[in-house]
Amino acid sequence: MTPSRARSCGFGDRDRRVIDPPPILQLQIDAPGLPREEISRKLRLPSYVVHCSIWSESGEEEMSGMPDDYTRQKRLMGSLVASPFVGLDEHGDEGCFFCFPDISCRTPGRYRLKFVLVVLDWPLRPNARSIIRAELLSDVFQTFSAKDFPGMLESTPLAKALKFQGCNIPTKKGNDRGGGGGGKTDDAGVGGSEDKSSDDEAVSPRSRKRPRNTKNL
């Protein structure tokens, strides 16, 4: 699941909004001959780490740095490294997920996020270098100024299912204004009102009829 919008948060740390929807990546092991039990074991390895960075709309230039007056700050704020969470998706299928619920962008513009999967070599040794196993570039998302921001979207079924199982990812009802600009955003610190639905209502991954085993990241 890749982001589509964000509200720029400027150069301070107050009243910031997270990129929406929060990126959620799923690790898939492409090994047709591997038994299901072995795949399940590999999904639970604690050594997986995913790092996030911000890139230009073309995906050819890293945009983490800021203009000369703000060289001590980075364009992205929040937790840029995610550890694995093993749980069931909204269809009841097991998966290994990496969630980035706390990322904000300081400046307006059109960007992409780049995610890098690294498998740490245990035990960690001084000056050891970990091998990059996979890279993924997100779709283009737009960061709006505060007055043009169209609002936050409702949390996806996947985010709700993972939260139901204990994943540290906030869910919200959303306050999307239908893509229009202007007006004030919600007063909540991350935008959108918190979803107060019962945990047993439409968020449990086992409460849904399982469709075809397809994956959309």
Tell what function each PLM region has.
Residues 1-112, 118-217:
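Structured recognition/catalytic domains enriched at protein termini
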